[in-house]
Regions:
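Hydrophobic alpha-helical segments
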Residues: 1-210
């Protein structure tokens, strides 16, 4: 077929074929770059959401410790606890504002908000062990929600190994390591206030620290 064509027609046909190949390659490159851009944009959005969640978690852990002190009789901690309660409430609102509409409507986040509302309104009427337990359950739910945020924003799907390990440490390993220390601090605050410790409390502390 090519032999029957004039040179001008051959050049036009080859040029058209070459143009098609170039267009296909350009489309492939553009698609890959678009995916990278969208992935990067999602990751940046995830980091912007995780920052206030981390701050909220720390405030909740501190509120747990102060609550343990107050419920065990430390009157000097009442004002600090009240101030920390306002800080946590503001942090919860900041996280809610930072979340995407999809994440904001997730049952996991709504459960965290309900947990906090219950603690803020009823926490001082509970026994010290119950208060500690409810705080710890709430914080555990927050830590699990952090993983959900990371998954939804592709932070835990990063193909670059170094970045993946960094995100895994930030989202999973470090919070899992720090939370037992927070529980120990809360228990310790209560014990120091009461100035007494039972055998079961010794066992509980040992199990957390082991």
């Amino acid at each position: 077929l090519m032999n029957r064509l004039r040179y001008n027609a051959k050049f036009l046909l080859l040029g058209a074929a070459f143009l098609i190949v170039i267009l296909v390659l350009m489309y492939s490159v553009f698609s890959a770059l678009s995916r990278d851009i969208e992935s990067t944009r999602a990751e940046l959005g995830g980091l912007q959401m995780l920052k206030p969640i981390n701050q909220m978690t720390q405030a909740m852990q501190q509120h747990r410790g102060l609550s343990a002190g107050v419920l065990n009789g430390n009157e000097a901690m009442k004002d600090k606890r009240a101030a920390k309660e306002k800080e946590v409430a503001a942090a919860v609102m900041a996280v809610d504002a930072a979340l995407s509409s999809t994440l904001r409507e997730m049952p996991a986040w709504k459960a965290v908000r309900q947990d906090w509302d219950a603690i803020a309104s009823q926490g001082l009427s509970w026994t010290p062990p119950e208060n500690l337990k409810r705080h710890t359950v709430m914080i555990g739910n927050v830590l699990q929600f952090m993983v959900t945020v990371a998954d939804e924003t592709q932070l835990t799907l990063d193909p670059v190994m170094d970045t993946y390990y960094f995100m895994d440490t930030l989202v999973s390993k470090m919070p899992a390591m720090l939370e037992p220390l927070g529980i120990t601090r809360a228990r310790g605050t209560g014990l120091l206030t009461k100035k007494e410790i039972s055998q079961q409390q010794c066992v509980d502390l040992a199990s957390i620290l082991s």
